[in-house]
């Protein structure tokens, strides 16, 4: 989640939480992890107790979400983090803060791309384009050259010169719009 400043991005995140259904989030998490959070008190600190999977998520969030270092990771706090974009690592802040986080992941893990999730549509995408893209572009880490300029994702991914349509050996090739 990105905005003009770290404070504005955090405020945006906090604002979105008012729309989250934490009971529903707990149910989803139970399905994802096999852990029923109802078995834990609201005061347990998941940074130190509970399943290892939750402790790993807490460590990832603490490393990437500004202002969370040293916080007590109670059940309500864990559910709030899960409610907006799930269990994924989060990058919340100004363009510089978010770009620093993404660049650290690139450097440390050698990754060459991201699947960015969204909290609202088109809002999250508009914020990325308005705030984050210029910062990444200025750093030279925003990919803008592709094998087929203006081509489809399929053309870019396959890079086989066969155009944007599904390939003949794909089941969908039997169907076309006429």
Question: Model-found features: residue ranges?
Answer:
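C-terminal helical cap(s) of enzyme catalytic domains, especially alpha/beta-barrels
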Residues: 121-142
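An alpha-helical appendage that flanks or caps ligand/catalytic pockets
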Residues: 1-106, 136-178
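C-terminal, well-structured subdomains that either form a transmembrane helix-short loop-helix hairpin
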Residues: 94-125
């Amino acid at each position: 989640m990105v905005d003009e400043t770290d404070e504005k991005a955090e405020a945006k995140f906090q604002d979105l939480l008012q729309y989250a259904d934490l009971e529903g989030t707990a149910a989803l998490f139970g399905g994802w992890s096999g852990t029923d959070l109802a078995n834990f008190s609201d005061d347990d600190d998941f940074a130190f107790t509970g399943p290892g999977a939750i402790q790993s998520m807490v460590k990832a969030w603490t490393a990437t979400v500004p202002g969370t270092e040293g916080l007590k990771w109670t059940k309500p706090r864990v559910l709030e983090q899960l409610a907006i974009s799930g269990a994924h690592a989060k990058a919340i802040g100004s363009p510089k803060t978010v770009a620093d986080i993404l660049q650290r992941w690139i450097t440390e893990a050698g990754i060459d791309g991201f699947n960015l999730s969204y909290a609202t549509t088109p809002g999250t995408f508009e914020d990325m384009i308005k705030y984050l893209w210029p910062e990444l572009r200025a750093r030279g880490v925003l990919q803008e050259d592709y094998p087929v300029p203006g081509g489809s994702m399929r053309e870019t991914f396959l890079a086989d010169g066969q155009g944007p349509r599904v390939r003949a050996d794909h089941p969908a090739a039997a169907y076309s719009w006429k």
